[in-house]
Amino acid sequence: MIASDPLGWLGEEVNADYGARLPTLLKVLGIGEPLSLQAHPSTAQAEAGLAREDALGIDRAAPHRSYRDDRAKPEMICALTDMDVLCGFRDLAESQALLRTVGGPLLPFAEQLRRPEDLPGIVGGLLSLDRAGQYRVVAAITDALAFLPRCVSEVVGKIADRYPDDAGVAVALLLNATSLEPGDALYLPAGNLHAYLRGLGVEVMASSDNVLRGGLTPKHVDVPELVKTLGPVTGPWPMTVAAADPAHAGVEFYRSPSPEVGLARIALTGPSIDVPVTEGPTLLLVTDGTIRLESADRQLSLSSGQAAYGMPCSHVRVSGNGVDWVSQLWTRAEANALQCAFHAARAVHIFHPLCTDIDRSVVGIGCCHRAMSVRKISQLGPGSYRAVGRRTGRSTDRMGMTRCASRWCGGVVGGIG
């Protein structure tokens, strides 16, 4: 459909920014057992990797291929149920303490780990062990579970049961074990090492098939390329906090610095609500109840599990009783309005450990984290957004959303069963 009429389906600016393709994917992710240990490349790495594998004559559909396109794949997960996630390298001292507590085959890695920049190499060394070496590492971790903090042993023990000969279990020791409650979200940029362990969530991401896996999977792994993309950032990974906005009553926003990655949650129990308007298309997904959509020329009812596509600049009103998730593709100009807010909000995230059974004098580990924000994005002040609005010549509200005040495009909403 998009290829036949990219301007109509995407809008002029989105088509100019991304070409004749939908740059955003929205899906529900159900995790019954640990998913792969993975990271996603940056645009530069994806471009280089695609060219290299093309030159080698590897079919783009081949299962042993790592790069299938030239795009980055930032993503965001928002929990619908309780979720467990491994995300980002934990504090360096914590990682050192855990490796030493296990001892045995992990002691050499503990000695090598002296600064954050050593972490990618440690990951590569562990994941490059032969199968017998990986089995010995996991066996040592299993033997040491009783000596690890409970929140670490519970998470790592379950992974070890599933993958008894995969050194990804040891890499899991180096990652933050994060618990998400319904409504909590995590934004994962390029180079963030992560693994989803359990739960149900709504996931929005840039449209790319580039996944660099290192372990905990029967699928193709590419340890050298995975290590190349990893950064040395350590410490608890901040959650993306839902932000209300007076201009859009009843809508909670989850924003990121990536124009393709953003969510809005609309919980309907009373009056109808206008879906925020952008110059790009809108994806709508109902996860609870029944929602009624109305545009200029069409009405549509969606129940839980159904989705719809809103045309660019379309004015869509939702009513009913249920929960609707909205993914909107922002033009690059619109997305720039949110950069300042995202980085300012990230700077004020604070964390506290969930574990109460940790003897810090012995291991010094605050291992499982929940995040709180001391203020919301919408409270950071509108000045920077208004400046962007003036530069682009558009009427822009506090969240940097273009109103398209001069023209409401008659949007067609199409349902997907």
Regions from the PLM with identified roles:
Residues 178-185, 296-313:
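Short acidic-glycine-tyrosine-enriched beta hairpin
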Residues 349-352, 357-359, 369, 385, ...:
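Intrinsic-disorder-associated, low-complexity terminal segments enriched in Asp/Asn/His/Tyr and depleted
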Residues 411-416:
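Short, intrinsically disordered C-terminal tails of secreted or membrane-associated proteins
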Residues 1-182, 194-284, 288, 294-296, ...:
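Active-site region of the double-stranded beta-helix
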Residues 340, 355, 367-368, 404, ...:
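Cysteine-centered motifs
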